[in-house]
């Protein structure tokens, strides 16, 4: 009756309830990461069916979490059609490979059975038992035999690298700068005369004591002076410029709705991070912030800019776009200009854009330059745009974090192809989680993602070829510990504060020491410990020597057993087909998306007509297309980049690349090193150029006549006779010194000649 009405009946005591059998877990299991046999069995024993393995605590460790600010940014992302992710493609290829291996194995066993049909029945029984055992252990079977396991469990050896001790030359304080590197070490946030809303936000974020850069910068920033600050990465530079700016905005409320503070950052991810920190510091104030970076929705940004936020955080490209295409937006009311990671902002790739932005800014402004390394470009800008600036050097330009342990792995000559195998061995055996792997090129980063993914590791990638959605998603997953390894290019090397990064691995040494400082600065942040492991070839030894010389703590040399490297090299060679299969899947999907887009455009034109389709006006830029093209060609690092000149050259280059075929492991590594060397070569050429002559004094102090170095004493005949100074007379009376006697072969004088022994005072008998 109840069932007819669609209601659920009550179960009586006598009613029999059918119990569904428990689902078998004997189906195909996903191949886990390469874990050695004993460890994997232990993991299997500890698994309990009472808890869902996907369960995650919602509350994270730490005093505050900026996820609410990130969620707001994620909502502005451009919506795109959902496609299969790279991880899904890798998983598909892995499953296919696994089934093929199983089929091959079963075929092999059948052949063995047929071969042994004529053998004794006892042997047949043993074979059957072995087959049953093999089928049971199939799910938990690792890729390695017990012999392989013995090889892979060999420990790496660590040696301390010796360095030649040299006295460091002290930095001279410039005459143009007012030096404020000395600060009160006992200064706290309460002593800085900050407003109550800011102190409340500082407490809410869990900040207890200011860092050295904050102690030095905040009091100077509150005075409204221009600042040129240099401090190591991970020392809290964001709060050092955000707090004085927020205090200024609270103290002096705006009279009209205008944007008063502009913060320029080099990368989108750093912009999102600075925006998140600024919003958290301003959560108890009536101060509005806006984020204008590439990859986010332009229309929503334009609407936010029309509302005239107090603080604008932007990347140079998107800011210029808004300045030329958003009529109501301008920079004439800017009171404070902040350049975060100023050395990157002022390199050759941002040069034209920065000139345009500074030209459009208000002349009456406070300017703050913050960087981990001080370059000539930063000094040039400081001399032109800063008025009586205060220079704050908390750390030396090439100082790494104090609790960073630096390790280096030597790559032998003609062994450049071992880099991938070494990285795979490190990530599988030693550093399994919270790792950032830096590569020189986007192509190599993508390849490493595929390779490590095929090995069963949880990997993500972050570089310029990805869409903004993919970049932020990779960053979010790494922060939330959904992935263990983040493969990135130098786009992630600056300013990003990812909590809990334990290890940074450099696939090749970066372009310059400055880039190295930024890369390894992703770990050992805010007083925590961390480790960096860099692979160094013969061509990169010079940079290694400079790093060892500058290091304060002892530097270690890590040596991996050769057997381990060979095993991983063989494994990677076997995986080449799978890597190619994943790349093919990606290419097919890309072609499908392009075809779909063309079909949709054609449909829209057929349905509405060409005139009915409203096309948005083209967005203007401060350079013409030709000027942009020339600039791109001028800054191309390599000959093949010059293919940008025209279609014919581009086609020819593509054809030549196809003829050559796939690069070997050695060629890939050499290509990475070549890129870094070409950048360093160009940088060296630029540094050799003569400096611009200026009417006003530059930031460098006007040095007096060079002090003559003290030369060794030279014996001159006429000087010795005519010199009547007190010192000369004293030397003349004393006679030749011990060293001079030694050189001349004279008998040595007894030391302490004036001393009278007791024997002289003995009474004569």
From Swiss-Prot:
Residues 716-725 have a biased composition (Basic residues). Residues 43-63, 157-172 have a biased composition (Acidic residues). GO terms for molecular function: ATP binding; ATP hydrolysis activity; RNA binding; RNA helicase activity. It catalyses: ATP + H2O = ADP + phosphate + H(+). It is an enzyme of class 3 (hydrolase). It is found in: Nucleus, Nucleolus; Chromosome. This is Probable ATP-dependent RNA helicase DDX27.
């Amino acid at each position: 009756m109840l069932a007819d009405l669609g209601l659920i009946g009550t179960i009586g005591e006598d009613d029999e309830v059918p119990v569904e059998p428990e689902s078998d877990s004997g189906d195909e299991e996903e191949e886990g990461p390469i874990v050695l046999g004993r460890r994997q069995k232990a993991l299997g024993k500890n698994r309990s069916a009472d808890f869902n393995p996907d369960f995650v605590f919602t509350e994270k460790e730490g005093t505050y979490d900026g996820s609410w600010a990130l969620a707001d940014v994620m909502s502005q992302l451009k919506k795109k059609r959902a496609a299969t992710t790279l991880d899904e493609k890798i998983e598909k290829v892995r499953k296919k490979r696994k089934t093929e291996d199983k089929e091959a194995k079963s075929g092999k066993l059948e052949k063995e059975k047929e071969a042994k049909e004529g053998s004794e029945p006892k042997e047949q029984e043993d074979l059957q038992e072995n087959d049953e055992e093999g089928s049971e252990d199939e799910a938990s079977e690792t890729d390695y035999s017990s012999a392989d396991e013995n090889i892979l469990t060999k420990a790496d050896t660590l040696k301390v690298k010796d360095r030649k001790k040299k006295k460091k030359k002290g930095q001279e304080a410039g005459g143009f700068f007012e030096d404020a590197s000395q600060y009160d070490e006992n200064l706290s946030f309460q002593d800085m005369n900050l407003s109550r809303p800011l102190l409340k936000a500082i407490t809410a974020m869990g900040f207890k004591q200011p860092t050295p850069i904050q102690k030095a910068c905040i009091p100077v920033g509150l005075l409204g002076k221009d600042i040129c600050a240099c401090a190591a990465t991970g020392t809290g530079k964001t709060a050092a410029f955000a707090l004085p700016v927020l205090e200024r905005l609270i103290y002096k409320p705006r009279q009209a709705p205008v944007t008063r503070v502009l913060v320029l950052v080099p990368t989108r991810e750093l912009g999102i991070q600075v925006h998140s920190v600024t919003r958290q510091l301003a959560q108890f104030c009536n101060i509005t912030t806006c984020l204008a970076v590439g990859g986010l929705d332009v229309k929503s940004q334009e609407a936010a800019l029309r509302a005239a936020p107090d603080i604008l955080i932007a990347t140079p490209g998107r800011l210029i776009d808004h300045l030329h295409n958003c009529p109501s937006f301008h920079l004439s009311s800017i009171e404070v200009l902040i350049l975060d990671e100023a050395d990157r902002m002022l390199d050759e790739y941002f040069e034209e854009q920065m000139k345009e932005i500074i030209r459009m800014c208000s002349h009456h402004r406070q300017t703050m330059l913050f960087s981990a390394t001080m370059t000539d470009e930063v000094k040039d800008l400081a001399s032109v745009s800063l008025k009586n600036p205060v220079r704050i050097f908390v750390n030396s330009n090439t100082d790494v974090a104090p609790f960073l342990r630096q390790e280096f792995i030597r790559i032998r000559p003609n062994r450049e192809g071992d880099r991938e195998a070494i990285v795979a061995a490190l990530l599988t055996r030693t550093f399994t989680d919270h790792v950032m792997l830096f590569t020189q090129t986007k192509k190599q980063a993508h390849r490493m993602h595929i390779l490590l993914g095929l090995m069963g590791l949880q990997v993500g990638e972050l570089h310029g070829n990805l869409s903004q959605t993919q970049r932020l998603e990779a960053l979010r997953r790494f922060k939330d510990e959904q992935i263990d390894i983040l493969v990135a290019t130098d786009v992630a090397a600056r300013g990003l504060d990812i909590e809990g990064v334990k290890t940074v691995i450099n696939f090749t040494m970066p372009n310059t020491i400055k880039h190295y400082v930024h890369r390894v600065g992703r770990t050992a942040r805010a007083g925590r410990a961390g480790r960096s492991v860099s692979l160094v070839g013969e061509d990169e030894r010079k940079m290694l020597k400079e790093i060892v010389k500058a290091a304060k703590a002892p530097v270690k040399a890590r040596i991996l057993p050769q057997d381990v490297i060979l095993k991983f090299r063989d494994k990677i060679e076997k995986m080449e087909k799978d890597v190619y299969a994943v790349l093919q899947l990606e290419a097919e999907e890309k072609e499908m998306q392009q075809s779909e887009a063309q079909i949709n455009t054609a449909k829209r034109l057929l349905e509405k007509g060409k005139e009915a389709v409203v096309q948005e006006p083209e967005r203007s830029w401060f350079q013409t297309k030709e000027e942009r093209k020339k600039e791109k060609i001028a800054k191309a690092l390599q000959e093949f980049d010059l293919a940008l000149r025209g279609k014919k050259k581009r086609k020819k280059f593509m054809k030549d690349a196809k003829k050559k075929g796939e690069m070997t492991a050695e060629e890939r590594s050499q290509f990475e090193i070549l890129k870094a060397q070409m950048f360093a070569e160009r940088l060296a050429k630029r540094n050799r150029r003569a400096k611009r002559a200026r009417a006003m004094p530059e930031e460098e102090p006007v040095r007096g006549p060079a002090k003559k170095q003290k030369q060794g004493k030279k014996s001159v005949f006429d000087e010795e006779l005519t010199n009547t100074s007190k010192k000369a007379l004293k030397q003349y009376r004393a006679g030749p010194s011990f060293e001079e006697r030694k050189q001349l072969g004279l008998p040595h004088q007894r030391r302490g000649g004036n001393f009278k022994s007791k024997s002289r005072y003995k009474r004569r008998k």
